[in-house]
């Protein structure tokens, strides 16, 4: 790059030419360091009148050192000539030592590495001096640099090394010779190796020092310029500041110099603006002097009279103690509806902050009829908003203005708000209860006429209180207490019933299974007695069954009259009459057990419902019974033979039904998701059978196919001991009746306690 293209500024063309000749001939100069050439630095000085412009001079010095750094990097020699001479002499000495088997004593001379030569040269110099002392008689002192050289030769070698240090870009190798052969061939090569090593270290070290000096000077000049323009906030100064803030290393100097050359106009302009007065950072902003804000004391009494007296005294103190004149009173009727919506609902700066800034005007505002009317209207707004807090519906400001179109103007300032608060009756807590206890809808607000009042116990009373405003706080708490008492009573009854059922199933498993088998036999005989009796007997049985239903209904009705003993006697007489109708010729089927269990569950459900346990218990029992009865009815259709089938073919018919049931291809559609497994999962009852598994019952509908066959074929054998089984069956039925009596008695006493 020619010097005419270098980004120097504010200097003459003659100075630029002088600088150009300096860098062109820098290799031939005795000293390369710019600091040793003050006539070069003087060409970069920029004067404004009779004074020196420091910032512009710093910029030219920055460009000078950047270009000096680039020149050092471009003209740096590789010193290969010196290195090759070193290797040539090292080979001569190594061969000499190997011939005489002395190489082990001078291990540092075996091989040289160019990278680590500077650190290894100290050891090499010691071995060379040691070897020269061995070859040349006499001793060599440690202070000596060479072996047996004259003073003139040593001075010439030192001068040559100093020139190489001052100008590392161009050097001359000094030739050490021995024309009279005074030292010999090998001693002369030792001195040559010592000189070449010192020359290589001097050249490389001086170049590294000069490159570091140039880089450090560049950073110093750059930081000085940054400090000078950092307060300027114009565009060119900020842009120049960003460019000069780039961090620099030895490898980034070239790219940085390219950026300075491309943005020469912007950077020089920013330095020219440095002479102008610097603007403050707040000059472009609007300056304001806020008026002092008065502090108010906390009012303990919010009555009308106390407020008026306190504010009258406060306004007098403000008018006498303030240093500024209050503004004249402005009527609120002059404000438009847009200002009303903006101040009331948006909370704008004009509506809210103006009341704070103009506190003296507000306190001196007269209490005329207009302000009082506005306060009343604001009071109605607050009341309406308090009543609608349960709505949780967001309205736009325009909607609220339309909703309260009866208001012509909005209250302005703190005086109107205080007047409104003075009219609020804070001692009446009816509406406060509404705000605290009313439920909040988070997502979607339901219509008021479609709210489910049964979703919670407290909502109906609050809704009536919100709409009519008639019920008092005592009535609300009383109704809530009654509802809570009902819940506690219901939970206590359910807990007692569960405890009674747990007592039933605390018997050992074997005894319980035996009792259930007898119960199944008895239920089977009751279910199928119509198949073998004559028509007349069937009619009588139907009549007795009807009497049984009537007696059950009568029993439930007598619970309300506390006549439990009479109803239980009728139930015992009905059960004993049925026992006399047993027919031993009819075989037992496994489906009758769960049918009887379902029938007894239905009876117990009805008793519980009639005793006042509530709708939730009924729903729970109904769901459980429907679940059990669905599988029961489905199994009954498959396992139970038709009525016209001969009794002797029942066993064969059941075998075929079991095969069809186990065959997935011929399975009935009702049993697509039903399968018999060797180990059935336990089915737990939600209410009637706590801690009991259905598979404990000897029921064919819940047993595996093999167990079902064994049960069917063993039914005839069980009938041979019918008399004995009937005795055990009577004991089992008596126990069941005792359990039912306990349950009904418990429910009756619970109902009496409630009454």
UniProtKB/Swiss-Prot annotation:
InterPro entries: Herpes_UL11/UL32. Phosphorylated at multiple sites. Keywords: Phosphoprotein, Virion, Virion tegument. It is found in: Virion tegument. Belongs to the herpesviridae large structural phosphoprotein family. One of its GO terms (molecular function) is structural molecule activity. The keyword Phosphoprotein applies. Its main location: virion. It comes from Human herpesvirus 7 (strain JI) (HHV-7). Residues 312-333, 522-555 are annotated as: Disordered. Coiled coil: none annotated. GO terms for cellular component: viral tegument. This is Large structural phosphoprotein.
């Amino acid at each position: 790059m020619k010097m005419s293209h270098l980004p120097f500024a504010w200097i003459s063309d003659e100075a630029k030419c002088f600088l150009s000749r300096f860098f062109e001939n820098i290799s031939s100069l005795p000293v390369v360091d710019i600091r040793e050439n003050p006539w070069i630095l003087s060409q970069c000085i920029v004067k404004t009148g009779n004074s020196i412009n420091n910032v512009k001079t710093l910029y030219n010095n920055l460009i000078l050192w950047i270009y000096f750094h680039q020149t050092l990097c471009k003209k740096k020699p590789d010193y290969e000539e010196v290195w090759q001479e070193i290797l040539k002499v090292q080979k001569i000495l190594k061969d000499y030592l190997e011939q005489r088997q002395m190489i082990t004593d001078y291990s540092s001379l075996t091989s040289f590495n160019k990278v680590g030569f500077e650190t290894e040269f100290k050891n090499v110099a010691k071995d060379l001096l040691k070897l020269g002392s061995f070859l040349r008689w006499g001793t060599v002192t440690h202070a000596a640099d060479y072996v047996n050289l004259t003073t003139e030769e040593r001075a010439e070698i030192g001068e040559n090394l100093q020139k190489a240090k001052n100008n590392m870009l161009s050097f001359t190798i000094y030739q050490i010779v021995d024309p009279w052969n005074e030292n010999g061939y090998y001693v002369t090569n030792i001195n040559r190796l010592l000189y070449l090593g010192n020359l290589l270290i001097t050249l490389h070290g001086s170049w590294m020092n000069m490159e570091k000096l140039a880089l450090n000077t560049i950073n110093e000049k750059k930081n000085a310029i940054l400090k000078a323009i950092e307060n300027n906030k114009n565009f060119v100064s900020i842009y120049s500041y960003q460019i000069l803030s780039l961090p620099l290393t030895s490898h980034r100097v070239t790219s940085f110099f390219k950026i300075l050359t491309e943005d020469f106009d912007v950077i020089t302009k920013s330095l020219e603006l440095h002479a102008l007065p610097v603007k403050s950072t707040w000059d472009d902003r609007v300056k304001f002097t806020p008026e002092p804000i008065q502090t108010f004391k906390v009012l303990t009494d919010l009555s009308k009279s106390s407020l008026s007296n306190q504010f009258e005294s406060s306004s007098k103190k403000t008018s006498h103690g303030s240093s500024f004149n209050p503004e004249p009173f402005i009527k609120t009727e002059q404000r438009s509806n847009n200002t009303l919506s903006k101040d009331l609902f948006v909370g704008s700066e004009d509506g809210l902050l103006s009341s704070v800034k103009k506190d003296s005007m507000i306190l001196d505002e007269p209490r005329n009829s207009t302000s009082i009317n506005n306060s009343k209207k604001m009071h109605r707004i607050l009341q309406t908003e308090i009543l609608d807090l349960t709505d949780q519906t967001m309205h736009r400001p325009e909607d609220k203005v339309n909703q309260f179109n009866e208001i012509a103007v909005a209250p302005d300032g703190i005086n109107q708000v205080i007047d409104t608060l003075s009219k609020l009756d804070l001692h009446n807590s009816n509406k406060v209860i509404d705000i605290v206890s009313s439920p909040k809808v988070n997502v979607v607000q339901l219509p008021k006429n479609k709210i489910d009042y049964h979703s919670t116990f407290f909502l109906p009373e609050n809704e009536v209180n919100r709409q009519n405003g008639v019920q008092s706080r005592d009535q609300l708490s009383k109704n809530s207490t009654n509802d809570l008492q009902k819940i506690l009573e219901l939970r206590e009854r359910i807990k007692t019933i569960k405890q009674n059922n747990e007592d039933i199933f605390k018997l050992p498993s074997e005894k319980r299974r035996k009792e259930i088998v007898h119960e199944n036999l008895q239920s089977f005989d009751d279910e199928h007695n119509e198949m073998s009796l004559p028509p007349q007997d069937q009619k009588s049985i139907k009549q007795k069954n009807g009497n049984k239903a009537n007696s059950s209904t009568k029993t439930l009705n007598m619970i309300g009259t506390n006549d439990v003993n009479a109803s239980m006697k009728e139930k015992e007489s009905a059960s004993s009459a049925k026992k006399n109708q047993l027919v031993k010729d009819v075989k037992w089927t496994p489906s009758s057990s769960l049918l009887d269990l379902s029938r007894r569950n239905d009876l117990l459900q009805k008793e519980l419902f009639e005793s006042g346990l509530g709708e939730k218990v009924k729903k729970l029992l109904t769901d459980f019974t429907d679940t059990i009865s669905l599988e029961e009815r489905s199994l009954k259709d498959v396992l139970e033979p038709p009525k016209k089938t001969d009794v002797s073919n029942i066993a064969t018919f059941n075998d075929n039904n079991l095969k069809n049931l186990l065959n997935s291809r011929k399975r009935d559609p009702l049993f697509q998701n039903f399968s018999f497994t060797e180990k059935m999962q336990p089915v737990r009852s939600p209410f009637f059978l706590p801690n009991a598994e259905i598979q404990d019952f000897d029921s064919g509908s819940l047993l595996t196919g093999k167990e079902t066959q064994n049960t069917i074929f063993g039914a005839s054998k069980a009938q041979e001991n019918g008399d004995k089984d009937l005795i055990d069956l009577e004991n089992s039925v008596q126990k069941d009746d005792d359990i039912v009596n306990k349950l009904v008695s418990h429910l009756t006493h619970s109902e009496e306690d409630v009454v």
